[in-house]
Swiss-Prot record:
KW Hydrolase (keyword) present: no
Subunit-structure text: Interacts with FLNC and DAG1. Cross-link to form 2 major subcomplexes: one consisting of SGCB, SGCD and SGCG and the other consisting of SGCB and SGCD. The association between SGCB and SGCG is particularly strong while SGCA is loosely associated with the other sarcoglycans.
Record field: transmembrane: 36-56
Protein name according to UniProt: Delta-sarcoglycan
PANTHER family: DELTA-SARCOGLYCAN, SARCOGLYCAN
Extracellular side: 57-289
Gene: SGCD
Medical condition linked: Defects in SGCD are the cause of cardiomyopathy, an autosomal recessive disease which is characterized by progressive myocardial necrosis and heart failure leading to premature death. A large portion of the 5'-end of the gene, including the first exon, is deleted and an alternative promoter and first exon are used.
Native organism: Mesocricetus auratus
Disulfide bonds: C263-C288, C265-C281
UniProt keyword Transmembrane helix present: yes
Domain of life: Eukaryota
Annotated localization: Cell membrane, Sarcolemma; Cytoplasm, Cytoskeleton
Residue intervals on the Cytoplasmic side: 1-35
Biological process terms in GO annotation: cardiac muscle tissue development; heart contraction
């Protein structure tokens, strides 16, 4: 009985200890560090936003494109000068209407035409020293489509009405040339010359040399040969002069005459002999030796 009273007394005693309170959160230096990092993050976000707006302003970003680059329904449109650091692949490149299209490079500009297997078919290279074209055939045509120049492995064709060579040394052909007409400009000389080799002119239907307003000269160092195998050689002129024919020896008798007769040796050589009452060719046969 006393034990039960003690238990009851213990249960009815008022408790002097209150309930325990646990604080949850960040306090002290941890809280200050957190606020510092949040503030730093906000500053970085503002700087990033400002830099983004500045880049958009400098690069001129718009709804249609960026800077001089415009995106249209037909493709890309570039205004002003453009620089490509890597190869450019395009189906068509054209300038604005009324403006020229320029290609500039510090070294060269190369244009390649490829097939389906990416093999180069034709190539155009414009360098600082030369313009080179690679291909099976090279053609130059007018706006109407008329052929002006063509070149391939077999032949070179000039389709213009006239081919003019303005060089001081003329034109050098290391091999033969075929043409229906060789003509100089009006009031200009036409000279056909072979300094170290022979000059041969051939035609199946004849060769005509005509000088309508001037003289015609044929000069050689050794022999000048006129040969007709099946026909004849005609010298048709009002005056024919042979000023340097050799003269046979003669004995002056009476008055000295200035009239000579033309004699022909058996070997075809011509010489002059002073005319007399009769033929004097037999007297000067020593010239034929």
């Amino acid at each position: 009985m006393p034990q039960e009273q003690y238990s009851h007394h213990r249960s009815t005693m008022p408790s002097s200890e209150g309930p325990h309170i646990y604080k949850v959160g960040i306090y002290g230096w941890r809280k200050r560090c957190l606020y510092f990092f949040v503030l730093l993050l906000m500053i970085l976000i503002l700087v990033n936003l400002a830099m983004t707006i500045w880049i958009l302003k400098v690069m001129n970003f718009t709804i249609d494109g960026m800077g001089n680059l415009r995106i249209t329904e037909k493709g890309l449109k570039l205004e002003g000068d453009s620089e490509f650091l890597q190869p450019l692949y395009a189906k068509e490149i054209q300038s604005r209407p009324g403006n020229a299209l320029y290609f500039k490079s510090a070294r060269n500009v190369t244009v390649n035409i490829l097939n389906d297997q990416t093999k180069v078919l034709t190539r155009l290279v414009t360098g600082p020293k030369a313009v080179e074209a690679y291909g099976k055939k090279f053609e130059v045509k007018t706006v109407s489509g008329k052929l002006l120049f063509s070149a391939d492995d077999n032949e070179v064709v000039v389709g213009a009405e006239r081919l003019r060579v303005l060089g001081a040394e003329g034109t050098v052909f290391p091999k033969s040339i075929e043409t229906p007409n060789v003509r100089a400009d009006p009031f200009k000389e036409l000279r056909l010359e072979s300094p170290t080799r022979s000059l041969v002119m051939e035609a199946p239907k004849g060769v005509e040399i005509n000088a309508e307003a001037g003289n015609m000269e044929a000069t050689c160092r050794s022999e000048l040969r006129l040969e007709s195998k099946d026909g004849e050689i005609k010298l048709d002129a009002a005056k024919i002069k042979l000023p340097r024919l050799p003269r046979g020896s003669y004995t002056p008798t009476g008055t000295r005459q200035k009239v000579f007769e033309v004699c022909i040796c058996a070997n075809g050589r011509l010489f002059l002999s002073q005319a007399g009452t009769g033929s004097t060719c037999q007297i000067n046969t020593s010239v034929c030796l």
